[in-house]
């Protein structure tokens, strides 16, 4: 498997910095994965890659508003006020200081794009696992990245 590219720290002299989010998809059967795509002094962009029956655990960003956009799969965002289910292309704003979590109760892998301002201290490009996330047993089928990419981009399902 190819290595993920290093996260992008945009040079100050560039006004536009393109990235291919597919290069940052990183699932784990052990825990939900958060991958930092890029960071500036004012904004961070992360991908959450969450297998079925996994969750992020409790998240809270005391100094940052965070927007979440579901790219693939079906998500449940859980807060103290209740739950919100989002399908692909659904988005949610979570204000600073609100405790929340992302739960994948579906049968498909879940990919969520998170934009945070100002950014937290996550080391760039380091997936972060949550030990409280559920573990998905290995069923011997196609790998999670193959399944997610096939569902997101079309093509033959179940191929590696």
Predicted regions, residues:
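A short hydrophobic beta-strand segment most commonly corresponding to one strand
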Residues: 108-125
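Short acidic-glycine-tyrosine-enriched beta hairpin
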Residues: 81-96
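A short, N-terminal "cap"/entry segment at the start of jelly-roll beta-barrel domains
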Residues: 1-46, 57-58, 127-160
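Short, conserved beta-strand element in jelly-roll/cupin
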Residues: 49-51, 60-77, 115
């Amino acid at each position: 498997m190819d290595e993920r590219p290093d996260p992008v720290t945009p040079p100050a002299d560039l006004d536009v910095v393109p990235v291919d989010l597919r290069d940052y998809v990183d699932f784990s059967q052990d825990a939900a994965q958060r991958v930092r795509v890029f960071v500036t002094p004012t904004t961070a962009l992360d991908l959450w890659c969450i297998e079925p029956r996994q969750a992020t655990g409790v998240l809270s960003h005391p100094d940052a508003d965070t927007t979440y956009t579901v790219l693939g799969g079906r998500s449940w965002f859980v807060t103290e006020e209740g739950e919100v289910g989002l399908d692909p292309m659904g988005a949610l704003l979570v204000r600073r200081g609100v405790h929340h979590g992302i739960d994948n109760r579906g049968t498909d892998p879940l990919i969520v794009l998170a934009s945070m301002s100002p950014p937290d201290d996550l080391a760039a490009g380091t997936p972060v696992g949550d030990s409280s996330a559920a573990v998905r047993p290995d069923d011997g089928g196609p790998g999670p990245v193959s399944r997610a990419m096939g569902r997101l981009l079309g093509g033959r399902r179940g191929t590696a």
